[in-house]
Regions:
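Short, glycine-rich nucleotide/cofactor-binding loops
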Residues: 3-15
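Residues at the starts of beta-strands that form the adenosine-phosphate
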Residues: 4, 28-29, 78
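Short beta->alpha connector loops at strand-helix junctions that form conserved
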Residues: 8-9, 34, 56, 141-147
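Histidine-anchored nucleotide/phosphate-binding helix
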Residues: 14-27
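Short, structured coil segments at secondary-structure junctions
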Residues: 26, 48, 134-136
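Short internal beta-strands
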Residues: 29-35
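S-adenosyl-L-methionine/SAH cofactor-binding core of RNA-modifying enzymes
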Residues: 42-129
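Structured adenosyl-cofactor binding patch, chiefly the S-adenosyl-L-methionine
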Residues: 134-187
């Protein structure tokens, strides 16, 4: 199961580089929505992602409408927005796709209910109001933070959320091993 991650107008290349690496290591698909605050060949983007760019599934869209269309075409049943606005806590959301049959109390997987996209706004402005409205307040989620905190780093937020969704879905695709550093290419900034 591929988990779509959507970054709307990301500004900081190193954050996106980290998220590219995260997506490559988890099998998630990354969707970037223009305008971007950098070029995809930006030198600041590359070091954070090391040589993972070739392993990541990346799509760039001109606007939210095109992104939403691509998500729906890929079978996304639920689109969630991560926001600092009033919303339900991320940990209260069930991403597992498990439903319980009340007659025999058995848990089963519902294939139509576990394909969820996680949408994040830019580091500086968050998600635009129109995109949050389009997603709908029932699907607004927030990560817990202390009362005086403004926000978490974008790449940290994506990592927390992606791994929780993947955990709830049984870490589908994980083989319990890593290829190790011996196969990585060292970044050469020249």
């Amino acid at each position: 199961m591929t988990i779509p991650i959507v970054l709307v107008a990301p500004k900081i290349p190193s954050n996106t580089g980290n998220i590219i690496r995260l997506c490559a290591n988890s099998g998630a698909q990354l969707h970037l929505v223009r305008p971007l605050g950098f070029e995809l060949d930006d030198k600041k983007l590359r070091p954070a992602g090391l040589d993972y760019h070739e392993y990541a599934h990346l799509q760039v869209h001109d606007d939210w409408a095109m992104t939403k269309q691509a998500l729906q075409a890929a079978g996304c049943d639920i689109i969630t927005a991560l926001t600092t606005k009033l919303s339900k806590p991320f940990y209260d959301y069930d991403f597992s796709g498990q439903t319980t049959d009340q007659s025999d109390n058995q848990s089963t997987t519902s294939p139509s209910s576990n394909h969820v996209a996680l949408v994040f706004g830019s580091e500086t402005a968050g998600l635009p109001d129109d995109i949050r409205a389009d997603i709908g307040a029932d699907n607004w989620l927030r990560l817990p933070m202390l009362a005086d905190s403004r926000s978490l780093n974008l790449s940290n937020s994506v990592a927390i959320c992606l791994y929780e969704v993947w955990r709830q879905q049984g870490f589908d695709g994980d083989e319990g091993r890593s290829i190790g550093y011996e196969t990585l290419t060292v970044y050469d900034p020249k």
